[in-house]
């Protein structure tokens, strides 16, 4: 299942800011970048909305897999996991997260990816 719209991070400026972020946490198969919310980067209709959860995005490039089916399976797996982990966490409101999968992530078992996702959240101080 995909992330609900209230949890999705969208827009070129948001992604650019996250890529320049100094708060990066590296794992074997993915990188987590995080920043505090900056409403000026959001589209005008989203600026007035109150964030009740954190917003996150997932980047899975063609380097991970040339097959869209494989990339979409990874995306669905991680979206579902993040939704379950972060949906009820109101204490994280105002945090933006960007997960970028590394090229060799397609070779990892799904359980390994989910475990690494949890460990990166813990390292970032976002997991209880």
UniProtKB/Swiss-Prot annotation:
Keywords: Endonuclease, Hydrolase, Nuclease, RNA-binding, tRNA processing
EC numbers for this chain: 3.1.26.5
Catalytic function, reaction form: Endonucleolytic cleavage of RNA, removing 5'-extranucleotides from tRNA precursor
Any Pfam family hit: Ribonuclease_P
Molecular function GO terms recorded: 3'-tRNA processing endoribonuclease activity; ribonuclease P activity; tRNA binding
GO biological process entries: tRNA 5'-leader removal
GO cellular-component term (any): ribonuclease P complex
First-level EC class: hydrolase
Assembly with partners or alone: Consists of a catalytic RNA component (M1 or rnpB) and a protein subunit.
Protein family membership: Belongs to the RnpA family.
PANTHER family per record: RIBONUCLEASE P PROTEIN COMPONENT (PTHR33992:SF1)
Protein name: Ribonuclease P protein component
